[in-house]
Amino acid sequence: MPNKNDSLLYCSFCGKSQHEVKKLIAGPSVYICNECVDLCDDIIKEEIAEINSASESTTSDKKLPTPHEIRDNLDDYVIGQDTAKKVLSVAVYNHYKRLKHGAISDGVELSKSNILLIGPTGSGKTLLAETMARLLDVPFAMADATTLTEAGYVGEDVENIIQKLLQKCDYDAEKAQHGIIYIDEIDKITRKSENPSITRDVSGEGVQQALLKLIEGTVASIPPQGGRKHPNQEFIQVDTSKILFICGGAFSGLDSVIEQRVDTGTGIGFGATVRDKDSKATISETFQKVLPQDLIKYGLIPEFIGRLPVVATLTELDEHALVEILTAPKNAITKQYAALFGLENVELEFRENALIAMAQKAMGRKTGARGLRSIVEEVLLDTMYDLPSVKNVSKVVIDENVIAGKAKPLLIYSEEQERLASSDK
């Protein structure tokens, strides 16, 4: 231990004197030499390298499911939409294969294939994207295109989308770069006319322009832990070329644009094709014929469409599909409410005619699968309110009259249940 009366200065970490080292840096009551600084620097670099390699190996070593496996998993949670599932499975598989093996293979650069989902409200666009992210165990963030504006205008900056993704993975940029971002209501940012605008359209064409670089791939500078940007702060750098962007929208009116292009039924002359008035295709069938020029006419700019090369169309859900959605998926709505009632030791039964009535009600409201939960909630609200205060209820039965509002749910009490069971014997 150096003598306190000694005039020499010593490193507080290794104990070497100022004559034994090149530089001794003074702090409040402590000193550190250049050798200890170098040692600390090496230790920190090694730890950072270990963290990065662990993160990279976790991503690269993770088994990538095949398109068939992706499709099978989607089938467990999403009813119907077979074509969209197949398109999505292949596109997502190719995207993560590109990340796993590098964007360049044998000198050929592999471009990113972002996805555009076109389908009616409640057809399963958001659910497909969410289920895909859960299967692949990657961060997932969702944004509403209607809230976005160009930078510098009142509204949400497009880079806030990346911030949402960072928040989902505790601001780990490496994890975020392997995530999926779903932008909903993309059809609401179409420009007002087919011709380029000479005035600012900050929530339409302007947002499309702002999204271009982000979707194609750029290094976005994101403020840590949220907040607005200012010059004197450090930013988190996120490479968006590795992020998969899925855009979705109902595209109301797009069917008319497509029909104008493909319709030859109004032609005249010997070569014209005469089409029966009653042979009008459904909206879902028309959507399947969509081409880039239709989307341009609808209001998306050509550059934006070019960044979304994979297009999947979803069909409108019919009564049979809606009934299946209520009962078949692993997390079906009726199963969720049955589990909720089970926590009260009460069995919940939906009769077949009740399921059909709920499906018809959702179709009447034109809300698709999205409206089913609110219908079930409306039907069960009073029962869920009263049930914790009522004793000896063993079963609740819902039939079509309950859905129509003509009757209340049937409550079966435990004594009655026992009596019915004994009478069956």
Swiss-Prot record:
Annotated transmembrane regions: none
InterPro entries documented for this protein: AAA+_ATPase (IPR003593), ATP-dep_Clp_protease_ClpX (IPR050052), ATPase_AAA_core (IPR003959), Clp_ATPase_C (IPR019489), Clp_protease_ATP-bd_su_ClpX (IPR004487), ClpX_bact (IPR046425), P-loop_NTPase (IPR027417), Znf_CppX_C4 (IPR010603)
Binding-site positions, Zn(2+): 11, 14, 33, 36
This protein's UniProt keywords: ATP-binding, Chaperone, Metal-binding, Nucleotide-binding, Zinc
Any one of the GO CC terms: HslUV protease complex
Entry's Gene Ontology molecular function annotations: ATP binding; ATP hydrolysis activity; ATP-dependent protein folding chaperone; protein dimerization activity; unfolded protein binding; zinc ion binding
The ClpX-type ZB domain, residue ranges: 1-52
Keyword Membrane in record: no
Lineage top rank: taxon: Bacteria
Residues annotated as binding ATP: 120-127
Keyword Zinc: yes
Any one of the GO BP annotations: proteolysis involved in protein catabolic process
Subunit text: Component of the ClpX-ClpP complex. Forms a hexameric ring that, in the presence of ATP, binds to fourteen ClpP subunits assembled into a disk-like structure with a central cavity, resembling the structure of eukaryotic proteasomes.
Protein purpose: ATP-dependent specificity component of the Clp protease. It directs the protease to specific substrates. Can perform chaperone functions in the absence of ClpP.
Family statement: Belongs to the ClpX chaperone family.
UniProt-listed PANTHER family: ATP-DEPENDENT CLP PROTEASE ATP-BINDING SUBUNIT CLPX-LIKE, MITOCHONDRIAL, ATP-DEPENDENT CLP PROTEASE ATP-BINDING SUBUNIT CLPX-LIKE, MITOCHONDRIAL-RELATED
Protein name, UniProt field: ATP-dependent Clp protease ATP-binding subunit ClpX
Organism for this UniProt entry: Psychromonas ingrahamii (strain DSM 17664 / CCUG 51855 / 37)
